[in-house]
Amino acid sequence: MRYYRITIIRFINKYTKIMDWIESDSYLKGIINNKPKLHDPVRVASFDLDDTLIVRSKKTQKWKLVDSSIKQKIAELIENKYIIIVFTNQGGMSLNKKFDKPLWRKAMDDLVKILTSETDNDFYFAIYVAKKYDIYRKPNIGLWNLMKQDIKDEFNLDSVQISTKSFFCGDAAGRIYPSMFKKKLYPTSKGGDFSDTDRKFALNIGIKFLTPEEFYLDSKNSENLKTNYKLSGVNPTEIIDEIENTKLVNYKFKPRKKEMIVMIGQPGSGKSFFVKNYILPNGYVHINQDKCKTKAKCLSETENALSKGKSVVIDNTNPDVISRMTYTNLAKENNYDHVRAIIMETPDELAKHLNNVRHIYSSGTVPKVTDIAYNIYRKNFVLPQYEENFDKIETVTFYFDKSMLDDPKWKRSFMKFSEYK
């Protein structure tokens, strides 16, 4: 029965070229398939959408093809046994309440019809859309993994082997100066690429990366099309090399009786790792808002621990005087003489990368801290002073525990390039 259903769907798809759309909370995907089988290994010709395949009007939803040669090139790719895939970040779908998704899907159905108008061959064409800032958003490879699973299901395969001829083409390449196409599409633009997420996406997958110029112009002397680029944020390989070739000195934590410790640091700075490995083994009560859920519950648990004369560690971001003194005043009221501030000194780009690593490692169950939260932290941050009831203020440079690299999944998560703004 399933075979006949798939055959009918393929027949309908071939002549209507209407995609079968499926939506989840995090992604939207549309697939049109009329191929009975795939080339093995699978040849994937994948593309970004905006300013790679189409250029969109900023005022309306109207669009046009970036280059007129795209239809013939898609036909040639299909002739050469490639499947055609689009991977696109569309955060506006979740952030903009006025985003017209039915209209957008209709535009994509029209795009598929146009892009495949010059081929009579059977084809597999899919569009994968990341709606949120999570594991599916490029350069994270959630959409790529979703594509592989869909191929397995669609063709009843045990595994999917990707051909070395596969590639991803996108305009977010981290180029420093305006590209040839950018000058053509946006004549007044003087800056380079707005992002580098497309290049990082290809690097994270491990397939060839092409800029639109390299794909469309197909120059024999491709060096003329290459421009200088710079990847933002952390280069995971460089960090790993530094860790494996550097003798790191452990922080010497000295516990004190009847003490309150207030941790200070942005999300992803290593506070909780530090607390778990250095402070909690000494019997300190752990106060963390992710566990308590509310500020009131945190304060209640802190008050309870202090009333029993226990040492406590406040494991929150605590960027400003008010957030810190809410706790240090409790210590003073309970006659605590030992109140220590520990500042986690972690580079911004590394903290954001670790935020993404934590999200990937958890398979998306631990949500990413938003850029807005980072901006609020930076805006509110004030260095702690002794006048806040502290008798000791320490700064800890981020310490990377080599043992974390023994976990293959964690190392794979860390080695993926992340988006950095």
Swiss-Prot record:
One of its GO terms (biological process) is DNA repair. Disulfide bonds: none annotated. Coiled coil: none annotated. SUPFAM superfamilies: HAD-like, P-loop containing nucleoside triphosphate hydrolases. GO terms for molecular function: ATP binding; ATP-dependent polydeoxyribonucleotide 5'-hydroxyl-kinase activity; double-stranded DNA binding; polynucleotide 3'-phosphatase activity. Transmembrane segments: none annotated. Residues 25-231 are annotated as: Phosphatase. Residues 235-415 are annotated as: Kinase. Pfam families: AAA_33, PNK3P. It catalyses: a 3'end (2'-deoxyribonucleotide 3'-phosphate)-DNA + H2O = a 3'-end 2'-deoxyribonucleotide-DNA + phosphate; a 5'-end dephospho-2'-deoxyribonucleoside-DNA + ATP = a 5'-end 5'-phospho-2'-deoxyribonucleoside-DNA + ADP + H(+). NCBIfam families: HAD-SF-IIIA. In the N-terminal section; belongs to the DNA 3' phosphatase family. This is Putative bifunctional polynucleotide phosphatase/kinase. It comes from Acanthamoeba polyphaga mimivirus.
